[in-house]
Amino acid sequence: MIFKVKDEDEAIRLANDSPFGLGGSVFTQDIERGKRVAAQISTGMVYINHPTAVKADLPFGGIRRSGYGRELIGLGLKEFVNHKLVGVTDIDGAF
């Protein structure tokens, strides 16, 4: 879908006004601006000047109703294990 908006803020609001958040794209000649916009879009993946894509060497996943977590590469493996913090203090140490 393509929407015409009045400014960058409206574009970000429109992009984030969805129960889904798998991926999106930002098209711009100013790469740094594209990175700033991408950081504000609530999706699991954002591509700058490229349509969304899936590759085995990139993490894949979304947020909200598009799912939680990541698949593929090392990040994906971590989604299927439980991490546990084990703190160790000397028996005579301060709490």
Task: Please report, for each region that a protein language model flagged, where it lies by residue.
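Conserved C-terminal structural/oligomerization subdomain of aldehyde/semialdehyde dehydrogenase
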Residues: 1-95
